[in-house]
Amino acid sequence: VARAFAHRRIARAEPGTIINIASILGKRVTGGVAAYTASKAGLIQLTKSLALELARYRIRVNAIAPGYFETDINASFFETDAGKAMIKRIPQRRVGRLADLDGPTLLLASDASAYMTGSVIDVDGGHLVSSL
């Protein structure tokens, strides 16, 4: 998708922005999800590589790395004792809500980030700066 987008923008000499959705697990590993963490780490490096390659064409490439977010799939986990204990270890003492991704996404999609490329924005309630 990124390649097709970039080719189209380059052919038209139009600027653009690509926003990848990575994960904090691309920066910090945990047990039992090796394939997931490897794929997200790869996506972070792809973001940086594409940013370098596409900058001269005025195409910015950035990523958002969400932490733990409540979804329909995992909502019941966060109600368990293990889930509540994990939430207590997140500095903001809560998991993310999908609306928490709106601001960072709008930032990266707008001209407010015109001088950002190759960046990865962590949206994790402070998870990565804690000693979880």
Where are the regions that the model predicts?
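Short C-terminal tail/terminal secondary-structure segment
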Residues: 28, 105-106, 117-132
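Short, flexible catalytic-loop segment of classical short-chain dehydrogenase/reductase
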Residues: 27, 44, 65-76
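Conserved SDR Rossmann-fold cofactor-binding beta-strand/turn motif
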Residues: 60-66, 70, 109-112, 122-124
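Alpha-helical segment proximal to the catalytic Tyr-Lys
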Residues: 7, 52-56, 114
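Active-site helix of classical SDR
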Residues: 2, 39, 47
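Residue(s) in the substrate-gating loop at a strand-loop-helix junction
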Residues: 23
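Active-site loop immediately N-terminal to the catalytic Tyr-X3-Lys motif
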Residues: 28-34, 56-57, 93, 111
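A conserved structural motif in NAD(P)-dependent oxidoreductases
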Residues: 90-101, 112
